[in-house]
């Protein structure tokens, strides 16, 4: 909440005060400003009716200039369990060093067709201007907003605990535990040194905010022998690193069971949603600071990838149901940043330490995979195309080995085969990153055919792409090849994803030229069968892995929709003979049984009030209704009772089979993207 005024009442934020609206005094921004889209303007002024003296007006010797009042941030977080900060006071802008100009980074990576291609390196060095000549103004109000964000570090132990619990589910391959642990360690020390034994915490946080701005515009100078601790001592106190912290903690609330968030004493939904809102606003604010400063750094690319994952969980991946395109917009920013950093080409930076080069590879793979999954889900052209990139496979090493001392690191490298895979058969090292890159390449091949408007030679292209997909899948090491006797859900997930790419190719062939219906149905049935097999294995173990649940919704629902549509079509008395293939009998009984089990599992594992729950439940009801029609056909002659069968939730014989078939064929079976690398 805001700092109290002299009369003891809480101050309103500036937008609410000027609009004469009731402010709820929430931090870092009030909820009313969030709803009105004025979160950027939401600040708390200690003396709103006072004005600073205009600089252009000459001062008389007999009068003393009044000091300009800085903006006061809110003192506490939204939920009651977190303690309040100490009362805040003001600080004069004179303490801000050079508030008008600060340096920012250059344009970044230049390719062979850029203007630099016409000059030699020595000529470019002559005309290159030092970064200190390039500057951008910093508004003192931005410093005050930064202090508001830094107030959240008072609750750093909560964010660290959430991060720790997140890594118990699955070791991250883009951002691993050693990276996040070091980030929390440095920030805890920075915050403690800035605020301990201080009677004026806000003044200290203003100074710390200035330090963060100064660090953010300062390039991170590295050397080949640099350690992770040394790197983070320079990189942690920057706004992009704070964005990564809040984005990671907020995303973890979607991956952890609600009871494990440490907020059991609060109302479950309110506490969880409150934490998510604070994290998303703080992460967004930090990225805005970086954008204002023109920052270009490795940590910025990390923060952007994590923020995009967070946005997808919170707002969805499309505008189909929530009218929100922020995830797609963020993907554009990620693409711009990784290209400017040159992550799409082999790393030639001789001053970068080993661990930083490997993190760069994983970041690029994460951006590439995100681009493919989002492009597939939305049916849009991908932004990062393989033909223009030379993306490197990360080494199959754990994060602990990547950041370890040279002796330990070299020993781990010695246990890699010539292709870079570990010879121990461990999937929890770097195998996920490498397999994700292979799967994303295959997905781009499927996209190239599916999004093309050319029909000539389509069947031949589809068969060629299917063969290439199978070869790519079989090129993975044996411990990533799925068989029914393997119980690792992540191995099954990679296998299902390759099958789904074939499913998309067959769907394109069938919808464009009406061929390959048998292969299309069989591929959908194969996907559903493997999914149900994995759910059964996981249920018996007592805990279903998040990857299985995501696959059940993201890949399973479109496949189930295909089976459902074809089942109903072939169950109609007037079904044409052309739809049935005499060589391949239609597995009607098997499809009905597996769809019935699929519906039950979907209803069980779809998380209420999160992500794609509404679309998921809608699809489940549609499949249930189709099964009812197949098993208990409606009387002949029943006509439609509504133009919108879903809004009226028809059951049994509410609408005719013809109308229901048209509705079923036009129903959007696509689910929210699963973002497997976020697990």
PLM features: residue spans?
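Fungal C-terminal regulatory tails
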Residues: 294, 513-679
């Amino acid at each position: 909440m805001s700092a109290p005024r002299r009369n003891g009442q809480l101050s309103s934020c500036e937008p609410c005060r000027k609009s004469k609206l009731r402010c709820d005094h929430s931090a870092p921004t009030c909820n009313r400003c969030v709803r009105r889209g004025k979160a950027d303007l939401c600040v708390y002024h200690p003396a709103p009716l006072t004005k600073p003296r205009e600089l252009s007006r000459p001062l008389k010797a007999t009068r003393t200039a009044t000091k300009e009042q800085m903006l006061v941030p809110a003192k506490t977080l939204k939920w009651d369990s977190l303690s309040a900060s100490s009362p805040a006071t003001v600080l004069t802008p004179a303490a801000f060093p050079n508030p008008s100009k600060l340096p920012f980074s250059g344009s970044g990576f230049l390719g062979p067709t850029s203007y630099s291609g016409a000059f030699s390196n020595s000529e470019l060095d002559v005309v290159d201007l030092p970064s200190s000549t390039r500057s951008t103004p910093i508004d003192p109000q931005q410093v005050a907003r930064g202090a508001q964000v830094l107030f959240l570090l008072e609750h750093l132990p909560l964010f660290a605990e959430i991060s720790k619990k997140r890594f118990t589910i699955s070791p991250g391959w883009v951002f691993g535990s050693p990276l996040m642990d070091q980030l929390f360690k440095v920030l805890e020390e920075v915050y403690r040194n800035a605020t301990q034994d201080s009677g004026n915490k806000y003044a200290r946080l203003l100074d710390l905010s200035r330090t963060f701005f100064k660090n953010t515009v300062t390039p991170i100078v590295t050397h080949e022998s640099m350690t992770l601790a040394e790197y983070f001592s320079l990189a942690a106190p920057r706004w992009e690193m704070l964005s990564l912290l809040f984005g990671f903690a907020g995303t973890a609330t979607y991956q952890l069971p609600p009871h494990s968030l440490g907020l059991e004493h609060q109302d479950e939904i309110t506490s969880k949603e409150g934490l998510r809102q604070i994290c998303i606003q703080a992460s967004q604010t930090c990225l805005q600071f970086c954008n204002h400063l023109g920052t270009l750094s490795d940590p910025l690319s990390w923060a952007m990838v994590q923020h995009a994952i967070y946005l997808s969980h919170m707002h969805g991946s499309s505008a189909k149901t929530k009218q929100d395109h922020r995830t797609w917009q963020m993907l554009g920013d990620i693409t711009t940043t990784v290209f400017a950093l040159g992550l799409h080409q082999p790393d030639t930076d001789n001053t970068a330490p080993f661990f930083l080069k490997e993190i760069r590879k994983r970041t690029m793979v994460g951006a590439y995979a995100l681009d493919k999954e989002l492009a597939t889900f939305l049916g849009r052209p991908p932004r990062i195309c393989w033909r223009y990139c030379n993306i490197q496979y990360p080494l199959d090493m754990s994060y602990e080995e990547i950041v370890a001392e040279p002796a330990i690191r070299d020993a781990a490298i010695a246990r890699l085969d010539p292709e870079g895979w570990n010879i121990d058969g461990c999937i929890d090292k770097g195998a996920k990153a490498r397999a994700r890159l292979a799967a994303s390449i295959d997905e781009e091949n499927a996209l190239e055919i599916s999004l093309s408007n050319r029909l000539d030679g389509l069947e031949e292209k589809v068969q060629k792409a299917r063969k290439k997909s199978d070869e790519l899948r079989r090129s993975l090491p044996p411990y990533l090849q799925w068989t029914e006797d393997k119980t690792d859900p992540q191995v099954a997930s990679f296998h299902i994803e390759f099958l789904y790419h074939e499913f998309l190719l067959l769907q394109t062939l069938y919808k464009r030229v009406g061929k390959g219906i048998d292969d299309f149905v069989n591929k959908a049935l194969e996907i559903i069968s493997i999914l149900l097999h994995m759910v059964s294995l996981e249920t018996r173990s007592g805990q279903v892995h998040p990857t299985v649940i995501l696959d059940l919704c993201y890949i399973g629902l479109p496949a189930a929709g295909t089976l459902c549509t074809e089942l109903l079509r072939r169950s109609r008395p007037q079904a044409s003979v052309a739809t049935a293939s005499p060589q391949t009998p239609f597995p009607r009984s098997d499809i009905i049984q597996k769809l019935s089990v699929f519906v039950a599992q979907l209803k069980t594992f779809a998380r209420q009030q999160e992500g794609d729950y509404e679309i998921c439940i809608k699809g489940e009801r549609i499949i249930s209704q189709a099964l009812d029609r197949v098993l208990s056909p409606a009387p002949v002659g029943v006509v439609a009772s509504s133009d919108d069968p879903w809004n009226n939730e028809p059951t049994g014989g509410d609408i005719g089979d013809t109308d229901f078939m048209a509705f079923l064929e036009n129903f959007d079976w696509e689910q929210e993207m699963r973002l497997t690398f976020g697990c």
